[in-house]
Amino acid sequence: MRIRTDLALGDAATGIQTGTVSEPSVAASGSGLFVTGNWYATHSPDMGASWEFLDPFTELPADRGRFGCDQVVLRVGRLWVWLLQYEPPRAGQNNIQRLAVSSTGRPRSWRWWDLAPSDLVRSWDKVWFDFPDLGLTRRHLVLTTNVYDASDRWVRAVVVRWPRAGLTKAGPLPHEYWTTTTAGSLRPVAGAGAGGAGDTMWFGSTDVSSSSLRVFAWPDSSPSVTQWSVRVSPWDDSDYDSVGPAGGEWLSRADDRVTGAFRVGSRLGFAWSSGRRADRPHPFVRCAVIDESTLDVVAEPDLWSATGPWAYPALAPSVSGRVGMAAYFGERNLPALAVGALSGFPPRSGGAVPAWEMATVARSTHTPTDGKWGDYLTVRPHPSRRTSWVAAGATLQGGTNRRNIEPRVVVFST
């Protein structure tokens, strides 16, 4: 594993608007980067040599509520795509998720479309969106998000898709949507290249009660979503305790939501954080690889260690078809950012068993004051290097609070 670039984002890049629940996202073009996190956005036209800070609270109007948290960025063709989540204007009202696009990524260059729950169903006027993600197919940009009621209880998950061709045009952006009340926190698969995940968007969710993955497919050419339940090895969704020699805690928010997913050829992969079990003394990453034509599980390359916890995996294929990961490892229980790739993939009969080869990028000097970390990080295929990826994460440097968060952008390759 080769770390080609390791960029630490300073205060000028983030406006010191950082948080320990950092939720970083990154997108890359051939020459530029766009990075977001709680609660900043920043653009580099020269792969990190310089940065322009964009304040998510003021860059776009707060006419339908104040910016809250949760941002996702993607590169779609020649456009930077920036998704921002806003707070409800008043208690008991809708919030919005705002989809913004720009050809330059610079301040004051954006146009946008807003989406509220009641834009999908008129009677959804007292619920709110949370925990979004974006995926890409040949023809669509896909949003997955949860919906909660005024008492913060989960109600449903929603998948929305927009035609990619509409992103380049002014005016209304048509959408289709699908919803389920049986699976939440749906994670879309990542693909590589201009076509993204190809002609079908797959997405997945965990069901610990049946030791299953809920797997869904929405073809570009169809208005309908098909779903399956795929049995995998069991895991624990509660025991995320892991206090090491350095003391402290950073997994108080950990759960078993799928945080990484990919599609390579006919293989689908999903990864999530599991609590510890008898033969694995620390929380670890569960991973299942599925054949999309048979829905058989063909490999379960978990990532675990006898010396510390692994959590918050993000997955993406490279353009060459290798699968990359970014995740956090608790070395002495201090969260460290690590990246790596899956060897022995795709799995072959009689071949090597798929396994993760990981490298540590940066180690924290402290744990967060309140034990809160996560909820996700990001890895993307590098746009011009076929065997490389771009990842975004964060560590704590020199203290325990949000001002000590140091976001990082990493380019790595096999």
Language-model-detected regions and their locations in the chain:
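C-terminal PAP-associated
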Residues: 1-414
